[in-house]
Amino acid sequence: MAASAARGAAALRRSINQPVAFVRRIPWTAASSQLKEHFAQFGHVRRCILPFDKETGFHRGLGWVQFSSEGGLRNALQQENHIIDGVKVQVHTRRPKLPQTSDDEKKDF
């Protein structure tokens, strides 16, 4: 299962221009299928990623939801309250990663 989650996370990183929501405070009782089911009401969900902690075996309480269209992401962001397993989760747009700068570029002297 960990290998498939790693492949899914890598696929999300490669899909920079895809509409992806970052979800925080996901209850440990929730599964990726529940996440997908909840967000499907806003638009077609391509995939959900819940990274797991190797030591505890539980997911980390955060995840990503990739929508098929920008409209699905927009609809999800417009909803004020997202309740999963009785817990209000936080939904944000995924911020693109900034290019890493080397130590030489950081020095300005």
From Swiss-Prot:
Transmembrane segments: none
Keywords: Mitochondrion, Nucleus, Phosphoprotein, Repressor, RNA-binding, Transcription, Transcription regulation, Transit peptide
Pfam families to which the protein is assigned, alphabetical: RRM_1
Domain of life: Eukaryota
Disulfide bonds, paired cysteine numbers: none
Residues modified to Phosphoserine: 15, 102
Location of this chain's protein in the cell: Mitochondrion; Nucleus
Principal localisation: mitochondrion
Residue stretches making up the RRM domain: 19-103
Family annotation (PROSITE patterns): RRM
Keyword Metal-binding part of the UniProt annotation: no
Described purpose of this protein according to its UniProt entry: RNA-binding protein that acts as a nuclear receptor corepressor. Probably acts by binding the SRA RNA, and repressing the SRA-mediated nuclear receptor coactivation. Binds the STR7 loop of SRA RNA. Also able to repress glucocorticoid (GR), androgen (AR), thyroid (TR) and VDR-mediated transactivation.
Protein name per its UniProtKB record: SRA stem-loop-interacting RNA-binding protein, mitochondrial
Organism per entry: Pongo abelii
